[in-house]
Amino acid sequence: MSFFGFGPAAELDIALTDGESRRRAEHKTEDGKKEKYFLFYDGETVSGRVTVNLRNPGKRLEHQGLKIEFIGQIELYYDRGNHHEFVSLVKDLARPGEISQSQSFDFEFTHVEKPYESYTGQNVKLRYFLRATLSRRLNDVVKEMDIVVHTLSTYPELNSSIKMEVGIEDCLHIEFEYNKSKYHLKDVIVGKIYFLLVRIKIKHMEIDIIKRETTGTGPNVYHENDTIAKYEIMDGAPVRGESIPIRLFLAGYELTPTMRDINKKFSVRYYLNLVLIDEEERRYFKQQEIVLWRKGDIVRKSMSHQAAIASQRFEGTSHPETRPQHSGAAAVEQEHE
């Protein structure tokens, strides 16, 4: 606010050099809404222009300098106000002086390191943003622009299937199998459940995808479980020897890549939870962790050299055993013949 309370004497605007052509990505905000932001990858250059728009053109505006920052930070909601910055770059755009008319200043942050994926969770937020600051003697004029960063991964070198036998002695014995342990965000989970022994009356069976967010360290560790999806496998009583196929499409759910010990502040892990409910409403369940990763999209011409190389890894050939399966439940069975 200005000295007389009539609002700031100037406004700042940030525009990206490739703003008209750059892809946007949806990202969840703190209030749960989805908004679109400019999408960047690790290693890409961030460039643009900061414009100082005077509220009263012709009237001189004194300032103590203009700067632009590129910031990556983590905010833990239980520790509001204490931001942990893991990327902090700054460029001075104008020295202290006077401005008498609206003026624009170009900036460029070359091949910027963006090591983590943007994330908004239950107890933590990881964000990247540009912040322009026009320093003034009384109150600074500040403008921020958020961007979204996606981290790309290569095909896992090892991606073994998951096969387990679980049960209750002399009551229930089942074998479940998933075709892989690592899935990209638009993958399909293919598997089967085989009933070896059934002496209790099962009336319902489902698979849940559970996201577990862990924040903090030491005594200040918080766990937040969120059921992302519920997939009904069967509704009715199974019999011994029955085999039930599983085919769960991940593309329809709001998922992120698995994140482990991000900047020693938080982790995000995913689990498949097999749930059985008997006629007396007793619940039996077995959890199995899976790894989620983001598959690269088609390389955009405007990407920097580093980001292009990272994305091209996806488009090249992969080992036969790591290539995604497309043959349905039969692929699972063949792996264990």
Curated annotation (Swiss-Prot):
GO biological process terms, semicolon-separated: intracellular protein transport; retrograde transport, endosome to Golgi
Transmembrane segments: none
Membrane topology according to the record: Peripheral membrane protein
Keyword Membrane included in the entry's annotation: yes
Keywords on record: Cytoplasm, Endosome, Membrane, Protein transport, Transport
GO cellular component labels: cytosol; early endosome; endosome; endosome membrane; retromer complex
Subcellular location, principal: cytoplasm
Subcellular location: Cytoplasm; Endosome membrane; Early endosome
Start and end residues of each stretch annotated as Disordered: 313-337
InterPro entries assigned: Arrestin-like_C (IPR014752), Vps26-related (IPR028934)
Similarity remark: Belongs to the VPS26 family.
Subunit record text: Component of the heterotrimeric retromer cargo-selective complex (CSC) which is believed to associate with variable sorting nexins to form functionally distinct retromer complex variants.
Free-text function comment from the UniProt entry: Acts as a component of the retromer cargo-selective complex (CSC). The CSC is believed to be the core functional component of retromer or respective retromer complex variants acting to prevent missorting of selected transmembrane cargo proteins into the lysosomal degradation pathway. Retromer mediates retrograde transport of cargo proteins from endosomes to the trans-Golgi network (TGN).
Name of the protein in question: Vacuolar protein sorting-associated protein 26B-A
Gene name, Swiss-Prot/TrEMBL: vps26b-a
